[in-house]
């Protein structure tokens, strides 16, 4: 079995592992890491109303320091496969690019971390760390692109229950914006969704005095919520953002004043807030506008996406040094973008995200330069060299 990053990535891409299907992807890693001396566990998690999902945990070494590589082998659907210039699951290499769904997000990153680890172990007698003291592990899920209830969140709980302790983690998500080495994600904003309801009184449009139209009221509330900033940002985060995503009254008739209006919204929030304080702030602003005249309520959706940041320090410094050595670029330490599985890992150890360039992820003809796969492998190898120095 070939152990270079390109070969591993091609093997993974050829597995059509659209969530919740595994399609053999974890088996590729199970054999690869098992042959290298890792203790490998396949763990299946269940949740009512959701598909059972396979996950993989692999570790070599029994002592600290302990560094983990994390990732997901599941991918989003390819869309119209006839629109791809190369098969969505072909793993074809053309003109210096590897094509296929998941190449960037994030089978390529997993392949590079695996290849780098195998190279490192080969150069150090098959054991991590000085004199064999240290551990390297892989935390790989098949449930990230969908509802993420049977993936990393439960894999971390399972690992902790069996006594696994992690010192640091690298999540190989496509963190770079334009060029390999331009960005490390050291945190993520929190995410909270909700639905604002405004109650009115249904009636005939010809007799408005007998009705109470909730539409002007919900419009006033929406305007108030989006016109006043939630905050001005912080040292590590951009300002929090509240965005309305739909407004509806469920009224197909043009001669009926609706009895209720509702608006869905999402907030991406920074470290000025947690879920409880954010909810309280929004509810207070709604109450200020509503007074005793407008009847409102907010239904909050459950959220497992709290804000977090890994403070810059020795670990981020060594990752930056490894990136600079290979690319000549000093990466920005960034907290932008959406949520990731780092939100589950941060409760167990400091975590940073660094992988490929994310420009084509989730797109038709998703692809990564072969040269970037080679460079990312060298970067991860450099991280291991410095980590166990």
Swiss-Prot record:
Pathway: Amino-acid biosynthesis; L-lysine biosynthesis via DAP pathway; LL-2,6-diaminopimelate from (S)-tetrahydrodipicolinate (succinylase route): step 3/3
Record EC number: 3.5.1.18
Co-factor binding details: Binds 2 Zn(2+) or Co(2+) ions per subunit.
Top-level lineage group: Bacteria
Single annotated GO MF: acetylornithine deacetylase activity
Gene Ontology biological process: diaminopimelate biosynthetic process; L-arginine biosynthetic process; lysine biosynthetic process via diaminopimelate
Catalytic activity: N-succinyl-(2S,6S)-2,6-diaminopimelate + H2O = (2S,6S)-2,6-diaminopimelate + succinate
Residue positions of the active site: 74, 144
Residues holding Zn(2+) 1: 72, 105, 173
Residues annotated for Zn(2+) 2 binding in this entry: 105, 145, 362
Pfam assignment, any one: M20_dimer
SUBUNIT field: Homodimer.
NCBIfam families: dapE_proteo (TIGR01246), PRK13009.1 (NF009557)
HAMAP family with a match to the protein in the record: DapE
Protein name: Succinyl-diaminopimelate desuccinylase
Species whose genome carries this gene: Nitrobacter hamburgensis (strain DSM 10229 / NCIMB 13809 / X14)
Encoding gene (name): dapE
